[in-house]
């Protein structure tokens, strides 16, 4: 089934309910990081321009389900949208039994997690949401991996369910990177633990030409190669798993390179003194916090020759500048590359911002967990729903 796109529909005079990911940080009633709000604006503006009466819903934070908590109210988001959009924007607190909305106006529903049954995809709640609209638009890629009432159930019962432009862009970009990638394909997977990204590593090791591992994940692979990792964060029980992934990659002509030099320190601290060492010289009392310049340069060459780059996770503790050079060099190599590049995950996006390469990455994914599950090859419930409701 082909997913229906919002941009293909006649929305004139229609009641359009858009599920966005407006889960943004708020401090003292003010939005402190507006990236997700900015990303949602084109979809809302397109619906308005096409003559729709627009309703928008999202979660914000992790309130206790079914309990109103002013700390997690959507009011700061409403205040932001009222300034960003050239139309009336208001908050609806009691909306499940009906809401008045007219063409040219935006009504933002109060936090969907204040509704009992949201998390468990309750059918009665889903039907109430669906009854509010003529067209349901799923535009929140960041929550597409969750089967909840506002992301999945409502779409099963709405008269029409379609993908918004932001979700469609995400799926197109990820499909381009994974389904038919330009070769060579390089994936960079960082993070603290192999265990949390084992499925991603397994999935990617079967399709990429080079799988670059970083952070605590790399330490487990360094240990698997027979080197001492001292007091570094690593998972001894997954050394055999790391060896298996390396062997599997080699069997299909791919590679999981291990750093040849590393940056170490005796403690995890923003003022810890960084020492450069060969990977074979790490002492028992030391911890690996970054890759060294030789390793970074070798990886930069791999990236320079790539046709497709998928980046999920830094290669060092880049929050501390003395352990950030490896991630900085990789970020620069991606920025300089002519390959199709996609970056996703919270730490990755923080690195993209820190090193100022946002406009040099082909596509920046707004989804954290959803991005990972897509990389794992898992079916995303919201996408499966849109396919089922497609044409």
Curated annotation (Swiss-Prot):
Residue sites binding ATP per the record: 197, 319, 345-348
Enzyme Commission number(s) of this protein: 2.7.2.3
GO cellular component, one term: cytosol
One GO molecular-function entry: ADP binding
Superkingdom to which the source organism belongs: Bacteria
SUPFAM superfamilies (UniProt xref): Phosphoglycerate kinase (SSF53748)
Annotated keywords: ATP-binding, Cytoplasm, Glycolysis, Kinase, Nucleotide-binding, Transferase
Pathway: Carbohydrate degradation; glycolysis; pyruvate from D-glyceraldehyde 3-phosphate: step 2/5
Location(s) in or outside the cell: Cytoplasm
GO biological process, one term: gluconeogenesis
Reactions performed catalytically: (2R)-3-phosphoglycerate + ATP = (2R)-3-phospho-glyceroyl phosphate + ADP
Record bears the keyword Nucleotide-binding: yes
Leading EC class: transferase
Residues annotated as binding substrate: 21-23, 36, 59-62, 113, 146
InterPro entries: Phosphoglycerate_kinase, Phosphoglycerate_kinase_CS, Phosphoglycerate_kinase_N, Phosphoglycerate_kinase_sf
PANTHER family in the record: PHOSPHOGLYCERATE KINASE (PTHR11406), PHOSPHOGLYCERATE KINASE 1, CHLOROPLASTIC-RELATED (PTHR11406:SF23)
Protein family membership: Belongs to the phosphoglycerate kinase family.
Subunit structure: Monomer.
Name by which UniProt lists this protein: Phosphoglycerate kinase
Species per Swiss-Prot/TrEMBL record: Shewanella baltica (strain OS155 / ATCC BAA-1091)
């Amino acid at each position: 089934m082909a997913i229906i796109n919002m941009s293909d529909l006649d929305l004139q005079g229609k009641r359009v309910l858009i599920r966005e990911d407006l889960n943004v940080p708020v401090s003292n009633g003010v939005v402190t990081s507006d990236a997700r709000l900015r990303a949602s604006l084109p979809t809302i503006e397109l619906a308005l321009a096409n003559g729709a009466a627009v309703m928008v819903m999202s979660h914000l934070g992790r309130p206790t389900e079914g309990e109103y908590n002013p700390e997690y109210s959507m009011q700061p988001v409403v205040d932001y949208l009222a300034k960003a959009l050239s139309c009336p924007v208001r908050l609806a607190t009691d909306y499940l039994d009906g809401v008045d909305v007219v063409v040219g106006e935006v009504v933002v529903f109060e936090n969907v997690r204040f509704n009992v049954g949201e998390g468990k995809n309750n059918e009665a709640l889903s039907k109430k949401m669906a009854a509010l609209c003529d067209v349901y638009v799923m535009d929140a890629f960041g929550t597409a991996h969750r089967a909840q009432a506002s992301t999945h159930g409502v779409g099963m019962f709405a008269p029409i369910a379609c993908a918004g432009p932001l979700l469609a862009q995400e799926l197109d970009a990820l499909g381009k990177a994974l389904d038919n990638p330009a070769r060579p394909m390089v994936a960079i997977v960082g993070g603290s633990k192999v265990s949390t990204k084992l499925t991603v590593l397994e999935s990617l090791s079967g399709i990429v030409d080079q799988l670059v591992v970083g952070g605590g994940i790399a330490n487990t692979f360094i240990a698997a190669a027979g080197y001492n990792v001292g007091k570094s964060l690593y998972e001894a029980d997954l050394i055999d798993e790391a060896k298996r992934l390396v062997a599997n990659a080699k069997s299909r002509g791919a590679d999981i390179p291990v750093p040849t030099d590393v940056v170490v320190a005796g403690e995890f601290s923003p003022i810890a003194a960084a020492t450069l060492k060969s990977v074979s010289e790490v002492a028992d009392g030391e911890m690996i916090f970054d890759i060294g310049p030789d390793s970074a340069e070798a990886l930069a060459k791999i990236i320079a020759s790539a046709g497709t780059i998928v980046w999920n996770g830094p290669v060092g503790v880049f929050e501390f500048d003395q352990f950030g050079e490896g991630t900085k060099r990789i970020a620069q190599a991606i920025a300089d590359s002519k390959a199709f590049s996609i970056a996703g995950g919270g730490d990755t996006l923080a690195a993209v911002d820190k090193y100022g390469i946002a406009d040099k990455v082909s596509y920046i994914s707004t989804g954290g967990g959803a991005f990972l599950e897509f990389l794992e090859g898992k079916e995303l419930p919201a996408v499966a729903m849109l396919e089922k409701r497609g044409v």
